[in-house]
């Protein structure tokens, strides 16, 4: 399992080990290369992809707590190596065993419930890559439904982009700002005390907008709630904890 950041690593390792997995985090891993890929820099994207392939190919499964990273590996790596048969084969092998975290828990391991509690109401944003490239929609909701004390309030337009879109927010900042402002309004209109999602880029984007608007809505990665670690990890954007 490839994870970045100590809190993320502990959170995701906890979920995977509870499900019976032996988890390793190779030190040789690097960025998946998506920013370079989306910017048209195929040379840099291929260099990074080779490092990722070499770091992870020997594992049974590769799990990422980000739909965008998992989708990059699963759907875009093989085509990067159309002119390199050796790495094309390796990329295809890695793509076949790469999964988004919550999808892996439910669809591959068959996890039906989690041992966690969270008092309060939450709403859920469906990130573009997880939803559209990997089919992640029902899986997080199914597991959240087993968290003691949690009430899930569906977010209006939950499938609409938050405006982050990787390099999109840099290329089209005005459009991106309008989109995240609309998303923040939907979140606040939901009445939920906590916003959850499965992709850190989306979460950082939405947390920043909500904070600038003075909202008290907490923003968290869905895995923090599923792992029962909300008392150990501050909400995203909370600089006081």
Q: Where do the protein language model's features map onto the residues?
A:
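Short, flexible loop segments at boundaries between secondary-structure elements
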Residues: 88-109, 157, 213-241
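Short, structured active-site "lid" loops
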Residues: 39-65, 172-175
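Glycine/small-residue-rich loop that forms an oxyanion/phosphate-binding "nest" at active or ligand-binding sites
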Residues: 56, 64-96
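Anionic-ligand binding region
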Residues: 130-152
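A short, acidic, amphipathic alpha-helical segment used as a generic capping/interface helix at domain edges
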Residues: 175-191
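N-terminal glycine-rich anion-binding loops that anchor highly charged ligand groups
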Residues: 17-29
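Short, small-residue-biased leader/transition segments that mark boundaries at the very start
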Residues: 2-4, 8-10
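Local cysteine-cluster metal-coordination motifs and their immediate loop/turn environment
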Residues: 6, 28-39, 64-75, 125-134, ...
């Amino acid at each position: 399992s490839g994870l970045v950041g100590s809190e993320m690593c502990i959170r995701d390792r906890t979920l995977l080990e509870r499900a019976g997995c032996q988890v390793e985090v190779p030190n040789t891993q690097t960025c998946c290369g998506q920013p370079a890929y989306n910017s048209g820099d195929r040379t840099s994207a291929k260099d990074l992809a080779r490092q990722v392939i070499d770091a992870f190919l020997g594992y049974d499964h590769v799990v990422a707590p980000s739909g965008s990273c998992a989708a990059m590996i699963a759907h875009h790596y093989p085509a990067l190596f159309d002119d390199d048969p050796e790495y094309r084969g390796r990329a295809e092998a890695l793509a076949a065993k790469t999964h988004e975290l919550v999808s892996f828990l439910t669809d591959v391991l068959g996890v039906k419930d989690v041992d966690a509690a969270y008092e309060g109401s939450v709403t859920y944003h469906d990130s573009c890559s997880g939803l559209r490239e990997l089919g992640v929609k029902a899986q997080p909701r199914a597991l959240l439904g087993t968290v003691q004390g949690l009430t899930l309030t569906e977010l209006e337009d939950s499938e609409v982009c938050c405006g982050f879109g990787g390099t999109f927010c840099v290329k089209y900042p005005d459009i991106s700002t309008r989109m995240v402002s609309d998303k923040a309004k939907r979140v606040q209109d939901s009445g939920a005390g906590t916003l959850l999602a499965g992709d850190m880029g989306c979460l950082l984007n939405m947390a920043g907008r909500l904070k600038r608007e003075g909202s008290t809505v907490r923003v968290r990665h869905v895995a923090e709630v599923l792992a029962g670690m909300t008392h150990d990890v501050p909400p995203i954007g909370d600089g006081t904890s």
